[in-house]
Amino acid sequence: MINGKSVIGIVPARAGSKGLPRKNIVPLCGKPLIAWSIEAGLRSQYIDLVIVSTDSNKIAGIAAEYGASVPFIRPAELATDKTPTIDVVIHALEYLNNQRKQRFDYTVLLEPTSPLRDEADIDRAIKQLVDNIGASSLVGISRTEAQNPAFLVGLSENNFLLGLDQSEIKPVRRQEIKDVYFLEGSIYVSDTKTLIARRTFCHQETLGCIFPKWKSLEVDDIDDLIMVEALMLHKKFP
């Protein structure tokens, strides 16, 4: 809890994966990928319950071994590669409310593909949201340079470079550009009532919580897995 408010952490983990077979339970530094997010959630000083939403009995068993609650097996219609994550989150919240009479003031989404995000990151994000009276949601963001619009170009039909607005390309000094950020995907936090009503974490009352770029690495294919494992070994993750 935080300031008397209850917090739930939800880890969505379906069985299917096109980029990396059995992605959510692929070994990473001696643990299944999903274990890193479960354990980070359990170590958070603010999260009261960590649950895993999955359509797989195997993933459910592994999640339980690492301490997560698995109160249901996700319905097949919510486990396709086109299912919006928000539908999975809302389903979990409604199940707990209707079947177990459990309600939480804040909801934290922890994608299992972001194993570099730890409990300190989670707690910083939760506290930032709770401490900001004017906000009802928060998402993790990272500063980007290579993808800054100032450095992006288009191509004409004849492969000549064009500015994004079809104008002449003008050289830009890195020191002159404004910072821009991307949604880095490792953490989403929201007031639960607002989340259910809006069905999104991103709206005009959403804060950005800045994370270093290396924290934003996601495991979606074998190349990602190799890079993330190298970082973990270098930084001596627990």
Model segments located where?
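Conserved alpha/beta core of the MobA/IspD/sugar-nucleotide pyrophosphorylase nucleotidyltransferase superfamily
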Residues: 2, 179-238
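Conserved core of the sugar-phosphate nucleotidyltransferase
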Residues: 87, 115-205
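N-terminal glycine-rich phosphate-binding loop and ensuing alpha1 helix
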Residues: 3-53
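Structural motif
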Residues: 44-45, 66, 132
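Short phosphate-binding loop-to-helix
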Residues: 58-108, 123-127
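Short, polar loop motifs at secondary-structure junctions
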Residues: 55-58, 194
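Conserved acidic residues
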Residues: 7, 48, 69, 105, ...
